[in-house]
Amino acid sequence: MIIFYYIYEIFIILPFGLILTILAGLATSLGCMCGFGKQMGYWPGVIWGKCFCYLCLSPYKVIGREKIDKKTSYIFVANHQGAFDIFLLYAGLGHSFRWMLRKGIKKLPIVGFACDKAGQIWVDERGSSGLIHTVRQALQTLNGGTSMVVFPEGTRTKTGHLNRFKKGAFTLAAMLRMPVVPVTIEGPYQVLPKGSFLVRPHRMTITIHDPLPAVTKEEGTEQGVQRLLTESQRVIAESLNEPVMQ
């Protein structure tokens, strides 16, 4: 069976996936340059993600989509199971969003240019001044129902288990006064774990949890950040039937 997967990946997934990526990148770039950034910064990615899920023989289901309002902007925080998380979230989240990305992605042909034109939010790692720049960029993009997706673990899991969350996404949410929505992803680790190049078909699930209220001035930034981080980690860990980190 593994030999079949290798053959299928080489002759079907790789060539068709490359074509899909180029088309999605071009559609995003041209659409955004023509003034349709809000729509074309998102919808080509949705089609791209759905096509990849079907191409890789990995169906998915979404639980809890009714908990979010399409007209509200959120910070979605999800566990990071693998590279396939990107396809799954585009395909199934059902809410316009942008990514928080490292600037190194700008160097990728077609994809980097498309991400820039789509208004993806680039992480500025120059300390406090960099955070302010990131906040300003986010303020320009995250409005009218456009949200952001962040992986607070910071990197893909090597074991399939949840890692401890970092504060960055929650600090940004507190500064922007935006609600946070924990999202549990299951299945992408089995499809394409970190360090593997072999895609293995597997069922996937997105579980959208109840939104956590935005940090208020009365609550204070430090206390609010800790609340959002702790509650998000707890909700996702319990959904995965894993111990809650203290």
Question: What would you call each of these model-derived segments?
Answer:
Residues 1-33, 39, 43, 66-69, ...:
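Membrane-interfacial terminal anchoring regions of lipid-handling membrane enzymes
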Residues 21-43, 47, 54-56, 70-128:
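Catalytic core of membrane glycerolipid acyltransferases/transacylases, capturing the structured
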Residues 66, 128, 186:
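Residue-level "edge-of-site" marker
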